[in-house]
Amino acid sequence: MGTLVGFGSLANIPEEKITDSITRRVLSGEKCMMVSWNIKSGTHAAAHSHPHEQIVWMIKGKCEARVSTERRILNAGDVAVIAGGVEHELWFQEDTELVDIFAPPREDFLAGGEPTWLQKENR
């Protein structure tokens, strides 16, 4: 997990290989966390929830997202805000780069843990 005070480059934050289809770079401050993801087409982020508020910013690619009972297609440039405690999941239809912002920071990610949505099928 990367920490930074002041200025820097995302490229200098170590990339973690989660599976053959998922990598991430984690940068955390005291009150929020940014996670840059690279996720291959065909990956499913299984239904899950967490107490953290989450903002999703699609940089590249395409996915179908479900937040509670609402479904949307997200493309590059799209954003979504997910309240803490709300169930959500994503199906990645193209190789995708996205940025998640979490507040407060995800304790499981600080410890280097796998995402709660990781399913056996994604390995």
Task: Describe each model-derived feature in a short phrase.
Residues 20, 33-49:
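Conserved short histidine dyad/triad with adjacent acidic residue
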Residues 69-84:
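Short acidic-glycine-tyrosine-enriched beta hairpin
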Residues 62, 79-81, 111:
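A beta-strand edge to alpha-helix "cap/lid" segment located at domain peripheries
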Residues 84-108:
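Ligand-binding loop in jelly-roll beta-barrel domains
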Residues 59-60, 75, 94:
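A cytosolic small-molecule/anion-sensing beta-strand core signal
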Residues 38-40, 50-65:
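Short, conserved beta-strand element in jelly-roll/cupin
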